[in-house]
Regions:
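Glycine-rich phosphate-binding loop and adjoining beta1-alpha1-beta2 segment
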Residues: 25-47
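Glycine-/small-residue-rich active-site loops that bind phosphorylated ligands and cofactors
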Residues: 24-25, 123, 160-163
C-alpha cells in the first residue's frame, strides 16, 4: 500500500497498480483494498480475480513451504502476464521489506526484463507504518497486521479448499474483532 501511494506521488496517472485477489485474503480485505486505493485515492488500480487459479494450484498441497512456493510462483506469473498487457511499461514497483529479504526466497531483480523497484526494501514494518502515516494513509490500512504472501493458506494445516478458507476467514475475523 505504501509503495502504491509513493508511486502515485512520483509518477501520478502513469502508475498502473495491479491487485491480485488470490482468494487467500482475510475477510473483506479485497473490497477494502479496492475501496481505499481505487475509490478514495483514485489510483489506476485493476483487480485481477485469480481465486480459482490459486485454489487449483494449491489443491492437495499441505506443506506450508510448498504453499508459499506455489503462491509466489503464481503471483509472479500473473504479474508478468498483466504487466505485459500494459503499454509503455518501464518498471515494476514492489513492496518488499527487510523481513521479506530475510525469510523469503529472492525472486529476482526483473520481471520479464522490467526492473523491479523496491522503495521500502531496507525498512522494517514499523518503519513502513511511519512512512504511511506521514503520507496520510488511514490507520486501518497502516496498522494492519502483517500477513504472509501465502495468506490464509499458511494457516491451514491441511490442503487448501474453499470451505476451509471460508471457515478460517470467519474465525480470523471473529478473533481479530471480537476477542
Amino acid at each position: 500500500g505504501v509503495c502504491a501511494v509513493l508511486g502515485n506521488l512520483a509518477i501520478g496517472h502513469k502508475l498502473h497498480c495491479i491487485f491480485i485477489d488470490t482468494g487467500l485474503l482475510r475477510k473483506n480485505e479485497s473490497e477494502q483494498v479496492m475501496a481505499y486505493y481505487h475509490d478514495n485515492l483514485g489510483l489506476n488500480l485493476r483487480r485481477i480475480d485469480a481465486r480459482e487459479e490459486f485454489l487449483t494450484a494449491l489443491a492437495g498441497v499441505s506443506d506450508p513451504a510448498e504453499k508459499e512456493r506455489i503462491v509466489t510462483e503464481r503471483l509472479m506469473s500473473i504479474l508478468s502476464r498483466e504487466a505485459a498487457a500494459i503499454d509503455d511499461i518501464r518498471l515494476v514497483i514492489q513492496g518488499t521489506n527487510v523481513t521479506d529479504t530475510l525469510y523469503r526466497p529472492h525472486t529476482g531483480s526483473t520481471i520479464d526484463g522490467l526492473p523491479i523497484i523496491e522503495p521500502v526494501r531496507e525498512l522494517f514494518k514499523d518503519e513502513i507504518r511511519q512512512v504511511g502515516q506521514e503520507l496520510g494513509m488511514p490507520a486501518v490500512l497502516v496498522n494492519r497486521q502483517p500477513f504472509p504472501g501465502s495468506g490464509l493458506a499458511s494457516r491451514i494445516m491441511a490442503d487448501v479448499t474453499a470451505e476451509r478458507l471460508d471457515i478460517l476467514r470467519e474465525a480470523d475475523d471473529i478473533f481479530r474483532h471480537d476477542v
